[in-house]
């Protein structure tokens, strides 16, 4: 989205020196969109970007957790005392895998795969955002309705993710500590 026309201040800080400069962004005189349209577009795109960023951060964390839990399962597969904890880790893995797959298409390997597997929530939001790359018009009522529905669905997944992060992972870590297992396993 384009920056909304108006008056701005740019600030440059280097070490202890700070310089500021006022400047104005003018509306393109050939644009048919109003400043209100440009502002609505800017806010629309930024809201989507914010939600997609949050979802992508969750996906990155999910992938790290999956890697760590998979390693844990491998390291303690033969340890009878860790059997219940391994089962707990499998449940967490299953839950976060479902969340990741709702947020992002994980099966894409080729250009054909989005057709085979479909796009997911963050992809849909990104596609909606790309509709605003040209022009200075604000979102339509239908655009806003679709955005709100997609954001609602993303937020449901993020709530599930946050619940796992705030409840299941600390519970797993507590159980891990109670078993007094070695954190690092070195095999020679």
Question: For the regions a protein language model found, what residue spans apply to each?
Answer:
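Low-complexity, Pro/Ser/Thr- and charge-rich linker/hinge segments at domain boundaries
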Residues: 20-54
């Amino acid at each position: 989205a384009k920056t909304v026309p108006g008056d701005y201040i740019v600030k440059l800080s280097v070490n202890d020196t700070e310089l500021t400069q006022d400047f104005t962004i003018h509306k393109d005189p050939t644009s048919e969109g109003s400043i209100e349209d440009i502002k609505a577009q800017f806010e629309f795109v930024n809201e989507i970007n914010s939600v997609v960023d949050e979802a992508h951060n969750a996906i990155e964390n999910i992938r790290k957790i999956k890697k760590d839990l998979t390693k844990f399962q491998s390291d303690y597969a033969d340890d009878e005392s860790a059997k219940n904890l391994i089962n707990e880790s499998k449940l967490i893995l299953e839950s976060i895998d479902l969340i990741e797959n709702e947020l992002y298409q994980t099966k894409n390997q080729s250009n054909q795969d989005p057709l085979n597997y479909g796009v997911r929530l963050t992809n849909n939001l990104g596609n909606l955002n790309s509709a605003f790359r040209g022009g200075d018009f604000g979102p339509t009522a239908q655009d806003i309705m679709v955005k709100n529905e997609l954001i609602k669905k993303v937020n449901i997944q993020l709530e599930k993710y946050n619940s796992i992060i705030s409840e299941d992972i600390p519970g797993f870590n507590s159980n891990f500590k109670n078993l007094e297992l070695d954190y690092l396993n070195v095999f020679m």
